[in-house]
């Protein structure tokens, strides 16, 4: 998860820098701790995905409702409303497939939209919030490589969720933050995903498709964040 210098300053002021630093260490260890194939592809899909989405990731990191220095439950509600409009239709669309990242033998399915609904319905959650239109999945490509890129963004979002849970679980109590808490230990799942991604997306054409899927997925999310939507997405 890319983090700007200003975000680092805010984390330090909030006393959460150690949590974030630990998260970065866990993430890197998760990516590299298990043995890898002796000769990785010359064109690495993970490096390509990171480069293709770095700008979008940076913009999103600054603009989501929970990115402020003192988030409230109102901010968490709006955060979930944005994610629901993005994630729920994506999960329904991905459920139509049984190959690529949707092959349960490669990566077991982990539905997350139901946790969003559960958190939104919790008695501690303030009522109201913004109206957010669901993304349009009709023009998404069905290629397996493209879906690997889509899932790269979805799976990666759980890493940030783990950091947010550690930062906010006390601050936003008594709300349990079940959606964020579901990713408290994302390392093993993320490692499993990366191994499957690298094993199945190696050809340059497939890597390009994965990057296109990831960029589209980021753009669909950015378009639902008021601070980004007002300035347009690229």
Q: Where are each of the predicted segments found?
A:
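Compositionally biased, low-complexity segments
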Residues: 1-2, 29
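Metal- and O2-centered redox machinery and metal/ROS homeostasis
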Residues: 19-234
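Low-acidity, Ser/Thr- and Arg-rich intrinsically disordered low-complexity segments
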Residues: 2-13
